[in-house]
Amino acid sequence: MAKRLDLKGVNIYYGSFQAVLDVSLAVLPRSVTAFIGASGCGKTTVLRTLNRMHEVVPGARVEGTVLLDDEDIYAPGIDPVGVRRAIGMVFQRPNPFPAMSIRDNVVAGLKLQGVRNRKVLDDTAEYFLRGTNLWDEVKDRLDKPGGGLSGGQQQRLCIARAIAVQPDVLLMDEPCSSLDPISTMAIEELIGELKQEYTIVIVTHNMQQAARVSDQTAFFNLEAVGRPGRLVEIDDTEKIFSNPTEKATEDYISGRFG
């Protein structure tokens, strides 16, 4: 079930360095929210904070509140593994388990949860391969290694793996940056289909992609080297690209910087 994300006064640190300053925003269910901005502005840091992935970096910490519906994912006693199960992530470069079969890649998360029934696993693999428009391309080689697929197919396989554990939210960190235009189009079409069931947040450097796939867009900016990134504005994507409120947003969209 798609859920809402709310950030309230979020500050992100790595040791003594403040990477992100005072971010508050809402990510609506069954929609696509795009994070845009120049390199180093904090958009990927904020994305990784949404499912506590930033915690793999020593010294990382968050101040403020991140709510999944009404649950604070940083509250004492909340298991980060459970958070990452509810809020899945697809990374910049496709990262299937290379020696694992296509079928086993999809159901890897279920196996970690203790599911062993072969029919359940097979049916699940087929269901989510169909859901990512990959089934017809791989149905005759399900036992072949996932690493043998093309880049675009590997990324769709990773998306199938991410949604097979039925998360509430799906995070995508530049999912098309290493793909060719045809594969990119396939991923973008898939995002449009997936938002009917999931809440999606995507980081992209491609402003045309943000305009094509997202319902709302958040623009992040870095005032100066060594200063924290911050959220400049968030609004409906059409408004951000046609009539932004902030001059910094207009300057970035128009190519004056970034």
Swiss-Prot record:
Entry annotated with the keyword Cell membrane: yes
EC number: 7.3.2.1
Superkingdom of the organism of origin: Bacteria
Stored SUPFAM superfamilies: P-loop containing nucleoside triphosphate hydrolases
Reactions this protein catalyses: phosphate(out) + ATP + H2O = ADP + 2 phosphate(in) + H(+)
Pfam families: ABC_tran
PROSITE patterns the UniProt entry points to: ABC_TRANSPORTER_1 (PS00211), ABC_TRANSPORTER_2 (PS50893), PSTB (PS51238)
One GO biological process term: phosphate ion transmembrane transport
Localization: Cell membrane
Membrane topology according to the record: Peripheral membrane protein
GO cellular component: plasma membrane
Binding site for ATP: 37-44
Signal peptide: none
SMART domains with a match to the protein in the record: AAA
Family to which the UniProt record says this protein belongs: Belongs to the ABC transporter superfamily. Phosphate importer (TC 3.A.1.7) family.
Subunit-level organization: The complex is composed of two ATP-binding proteins (PstB), two transmembrane proteins (PstC and PstA) and a solute-binding protein (PstS).
Function: Part of the ABC transporter complex PstSACB involved in phosphate import. Responsible for energy coupling to the transport system.
Name of the protein: Phosphate import ATP-binding protein PstB
Organism: Mycobacterium leprae (strain TN)
